[in-house]
A protein has these predicted regions:
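Short beta-strand-centered interaction patches in the first periplasmic/extracellular domains
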Residues: 118-128, 161-230
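Classical Sec-dependent N-terminal signal peptides that target proteins to the secretory pathway
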Residues: 1-17
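Soluble non-cytosolic domains of exported or imported proteins
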Residues: 138-146, 174-182, 241
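Extracytoplasmic/secreted envelope proteins and their assembly/folding machinery
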Residues: 105, 145-152, 181-185, 244-248
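Surface-exposed cap/loop segments at beta↔alpha junctions
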Residues: 75-156
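Juxtamembrane "anchor/assembly" segments of surface/extracellular structural proteins
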Residues: 14-83, 126-128, 210-282
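LysM (lysin motif) carbohydrate-binding repeats in extracellular/periplasmic proteins that recognize
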Residues: 158, 194, 257
Length: 282
């Protein structure tokens, strides 16, 4: 695992005017090299539409939630007429200097009539397909992994990473007219398990975490815009950080918190000045 430090260039004469976000950050691999990152960029796609300006974004991802969600909001100067169908594919990317990373993949969560102006488009990740897939069967001599693989296949999904732990075979498990999400909860209950499951990057995880190749460091006065504790959790505010995912580890250097922590939630959204801010919870 490689450790990285994300540096902000704090140029105080520019801070109030906003160009801080055009000088945004440095990405430094310890004792190896520093990569300068300028000019934050966005790209939001819903169905056949692509938006790179005139929109505000909000992306929510939490390991305590079954699904990630996002919203593409249109500014007062930009009210397009959209024609979108529920389950049209959707992607939101954030990044710098032409290098963008997916922060959301999923689908449009409802229908949008082309005859009306839209204020926003709501999106849900692949769990939307699981919510609309009904399981109605009795399963014999099976394991949790076999059942979950079947549920995913019924929803038309094949990318998954399931726990490699060995569980005893259950002789019979009836599931009657439950969504695939409810069916997974029934499987967990039948085996007495309390394990997380979610999608990340289009891959379904059950009692597993997405691979992490880099650990990023956040430091007071360098790349932490604000750090506060509320509701029993810490909230760290920084600039657009598309490379931070929930269940990943980050390293903190701050008088209040120091050391490595696991991210429980990530929210990226447009602030009142029109810039993307990422809020990391742990």
């Amino acid at each position: 695992m490689v450790f990285f430090t994300l540096f902000l260039l704090f140029v105080f004469p520019f801070l109030q005017a906003g160009p801080l976000d055009n000088w945004v950050s440095f990405l430094k691999e310890a004792a190896v090299e520093t990569k300068e990152l300028y000019y934050p960029q966005i790209s939001a796609q819903a169905g056949s539409y692509t938006f790179e300006e005139g929109v505000e974004l909000e992306i929510y991802s939490s390991k305590s939630s079954y699904y990630d969600w996002a919203k593409i909001r249109f500014t007062s100067q930009f009210r397009p007429k959209l024609s979108l169908k529920k389950k049209d594919p959707a992607t939101i990317q954030l990044g710098y200097d032409g290098t963008l990373e997916d922060v959301f993949t999923g689908f449009v969560s409802g229908n949008y009539d082309g005859g009306t102006y839209a204020n926003e488009v709501a999106l849900k990740d692949e769990m939307l397909l699981m919510e609309e897939t009904i399981i109605n069967d009795t399963f014999l001599d099976t394991t949790p992994q076999e059942l979950i693989s079947y549920f995913l296949a019924q929803a038309g999904l094949s990318k998954m990473k399931l726990s490699s732990k060995t569980y005893p075979t259950r002789k019979m498990l009836p599931i009657r007219r439950q969504t695939a999400v409810q069916a997974i909860n029934a499987v967990n209950a039948a085996w007495g398990l309390r394990v997380p499951f979610f999608f990340s990057g289009g891959v379904f995880y059950w009692d597993e975490k997405p691979e992490q190749k880099k650990v990023y460091t956040f430091e007071r006065g360098v790349n932490i815009l604000n750090l506060r504790r509320a509701g029993g959790v810490w909230e760290l505010e920084t600039v657009s950080a598309p490379f931070i995912k929930h269940s990943h580890k980050i390293n903190l250097i701050h008088p209040q918190v120091s050391g490595e922590v696991e991210v429980s939630k990530v929210v990226s959204k447009t602030n009142d000045s029109g810039f993307i801010r990422t809020y990391i919870y742990f």
